């Protein structure tokens, strides 16, 4: 849903093999047809931001037609757990004097008794299994009253009942009216999904329409309803190899860090959270959270920023807001290898290195098995270019500002002036960590580390651990309050309901995200996405991208005919909320849903003044869709809206 599988290295080949060898069917749900849907796959064109309506309709069908795995829901999720009228969990402490606050109430469907379930911990506080009476037949469908610890009646329902009630209004017909996917297609898609071992990809990043966190939660719920969680062929947790790369770590909640050599240190007053975590506590990184602090100095002043290898103007929605923030800072330092637009705002540009110039051992991300790999420097930077690894630059800056901190926290106690010195220092730590990892494998199983080391030396990678299925949540817990998949989030119910999130994930579009375009008019959704060759911060400057890249704006022929616009025409796009304007050539194609425009991200609209070579003027062609965005951030999680709405005219 909303993802092209062609962009991530290896994913497309895995899908291609599955189709060829297993007959796997692939369905893409997207406002535009991605490259992966061009041959042998199905494309369901959906209105932007309405994925949640489709998902709730599919879940509603799965419940009504008994397609879901109800035994799995009763045993391995919080579906049978009781919740109050405000959807908060019913705990043992609420129903029994002296009861436990982390044990949750379920009703036995045979005896009618209320029983309590929770996670057992050993003396070290580690998970030791789920504390559940095996004879309990947890009731998914209970709704009624129970007696609390003070003898009062408490109205409750199971999380499943609340979930089903939330999905019930979403009939196939209602979802069709919202998504533009025919009702019959929705019904058939659901039946095929549940009867043919379906899995929904859990996405690449959720930054589209201001409702993405709940859409991804619904995607997870759909996978959970199949009952194939962490089972072969199902929605799984990847294995991990257990390889720890060289790094300096910092635990903000404890104000404590660890140097690359393992030495711990304490930061006085360091328990304070980063600003994005204050404003968006479940965020994994919301850069624009600092913008208000830059302007107002509250809750504390921010006067400088380092930007490391990030194409900020092609990543950060609302380009004008970003530019204003950068201009207001006293110091902007950019570490990069290419002339991205953010350099126009930099006081210092530090030329860094590229992965082809690095030496490192690491785990292989996003692979089902626990693999490790080596990256060996194939080249060095040119002799007349003082390019350095970002870590080298950071270490030297910290050494000059706080030499004692550099020594204590980074094990960097003197200036390193040459690349050979850096290799000896840093690569020495890299190799030491690798040798320790190999020795640890040999200690657990004689010869195993030697096998892995030989594999890596010969082919560049090795499988350390094959995926162990049936682990989560059967033997190990998830990081939820119950340790199980939660179809009604107890974290949201207890902490974030008043912040704009829903305990039961559901479809909605925030009013603030962007103005909804009028249908059959000159107003459109503007959506963006990547292709498989040119949409990245590096390849957008490659000479082949001049010919392989597409810097046009796609429009459906139905819309083109209505507006008198043809392929090759120049159009002006104007943001509905701000009036920001940009121009690009049009391509009429049935690969985008009517009422929406599509433009490749990380592709065109580079406005930098640093490029002097006229051979690269083509990078300025087209638009950057972030020019037109509101920059709306989801509450609590801080996800940005990359999609927006515009008005169009031919010029």
What would you call each of these model-derived segments?
Residues 1-28, 53, 131, 136-147, ...:
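Extended redox/cofactor-interaction regions of prokaryotic respiratory oxidoreductases
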Residues 40-41, 196-197, 302, 329, ...:
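Short, well-ordered alpha-helix to beta-strand connector turns
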Residues 378-379, 387-447, 538, 543-554, ...:
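Long, contiguous, secondary-structure-rich segments that constitute the structural scaffold
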Residues 75-78, 192-193, 235-246, 410-430:
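A glycine-rich phosphate-binding loop feature that marks nucleotide/adenosyl-phosphate handling sites
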Residues 21, 34-195:
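Long, well-ordered, tryptophan-enriched scaffold segments
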Residues 1, 39-40, 155-156, 169-173, ...:
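Flexible glycine/proline-enriched surface loops and loop-helix/loop-strand junctions
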Residues 356-382, 393, 398-403:
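Glycine/threonine-rich phosphate-binding loop and adjacent beta-strand/alpha-helix elements that clamp
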Residues 70-76, 178, 188, 201-206, ...:
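Short coil/turn segments at secondary-structure boundaries
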